[in-house]
Amino acid sequence: MASIRELHEQLVKKERSAVEITQETLDHIQELEPKLHSFLHITAQQALEQARAVDAKIAAGEEIGLLAGIPIGVKDNMCTKGIPTTCASRILENFVPPYESTVTQKLLDAGAVVVGKTNLDEFAMGSSTENSAYQVTANPWDLSRVPGGSSGGSAAAVAAEECVVALGSDTGGSIRQPASFCGVVGLKPTYGLVSRYGLVAYASSLDQIGPFGKSVEDTAILLKAIAGYDHQDSTSLKVEIPDYVASLKPDLKARSKLRIGIIKETFGEGLDSVVEQAVTKAIEQLQRLGAEVHVISCPNFRYGVPSYYIIAPSEASANLARYDGVKYGWRAPEGDNLLSMYKRTRATGFGAEVKRRIMIGTYALSAGYYDAYYLKAQKVRTLIKQDFENAFKNVDVLVSPTAPTTAFKAGEKTADPISMYLNDLMTIPVNLAGLPGLSVPCGFDEQGLPIGLQLIGKVLREDQLLQIAYAYEQSTSWHLSQPKIS
């Protein structure tokens, strides 16, 4: 599939119509979905209507933006008016939002064509997209393996060219880890840069919406469209949004002395040797492009996972208390009274992983353990943030592997929650600190599975991350590889 810019030029020159591009995309989805299961809902009728509106503008001689007529996937935890939003949970299987999330409204205003809602781990809780109540998404590079999670449907859809770009959400790595597993670009913005209004909450102090793309430029274009202040989100940042696309240049030498820090705690035990080799070569390539490389220590990095799995479940236990079968969503048919209906609805409506995290969170917040667990985890979070602040006194950007391994086999880790949680070892600290993080393809293992390089930036320096990722991407060919889906 062509890039956003290439498709835009084809539309403007009237070489192809938006309807033709949309129909080709829908046909491609129809062909691949029996194997991939990237989408929970395919919105063919609405997509074609949106495409016809773009064609009408072009026919009338009106100017269109870069995203007009571009097929986009949206993770199914973002509210879409009149279109089911299930969060891949049985408890929301019949929920159709009466309003549009801010990010999807921005896409519609830009003329983008939403071709469907993508699969995820239930309520975005997972690292493999195996926790969906409806289907398990396959990795386009190897159908027996997972695409990562929780935004696995979005990552797989972009990798398989079922859409040009897609939206995901990232609470502890849910954009970057699937991007690494599927060989695409994924960016988690600074906390507050993108509105969370209409995003179904998992952990409100950590959740952030971000873009997936086949290339850095496509990712930058989508970020530019969704970033910005929103009065409907109390955590939204009132800041000027730079032109992320204009800052993309293929050479780092134009920058004055770019300093990159290697987080030494992300190398060593638990990291696959093939991942370490690929990331090391990527760092060497950044040096050749003009970057100055330093080794940096973030001593509390290793405590990211244990602190996250107290903070995030605690917030989830509060956020998910609203699902009781009364106002919306699914309700258990049996029940002698209101209390038994509540219990049955939640017991049968939530999956095992969601119930596990609600229980962990409720326990951590209980009177006898609040100080010992929740408050202590918040103190560790502060230490992790301070580690990053100290590191950024000496360097501009930090690098690490995105994930410790390449994509694993479906079913391999489902019986071992701790092993599954460790997939986000490299990404979780970035969320705890509210920083921007980006994963860019940097190689393949001996089985042909993608590997990702993680770039971590200072607050609101997405422009710098995208610039570095773009320079690296343009000097390599990893992003040009395409999975062969048989």
Curated annotation (Swiss-Prot):
Keyword Ligase among UniProt keywords: yes
Family designation: Belongs to the amidase family. GatA subfamily.
Keywords: ATP-binding, Ligase, Nucleotide-binding, Protein biosynthesis
Species, as recorded: Nostoc sp. (strain PCC 7120 / SAG 25.82 / UTEX 2576)
Domain of life: Bacteria
Role summary: Allows the formation of correctly charged Gln-tRNA(Gln) through the transamidation of misacylated Glu-tRNA(Gln) in organisms which lack glutaminyl-tRNA synthetase. The reaction takes place in the presence of glutamine and ATP through an activated gamma-phospho-Glu-tRNA(Gln).
Xref: InterPro entries: Amidase (IPR000120), Amidase_CS (IPR020556), Amidase_dom (IPR023631), AS_sf (IPR036928), GatA (IPR004412)
Name of the coding gene: gatA
Source taxonomy: Bacteria, Bacillati, Cyanobacteriota, Cyanophyceae, Nostocales
Catalytic activity: L-glutamyl-tRNA(Gln) + L-glutamine + ATP + H2O = L-glutaminyl-tRNA(Gln) + L-glutamate + ADP + phosphate + H(+)
Name of protein: Glutamyl-tRNA(Gln) amidotransferase subunit A
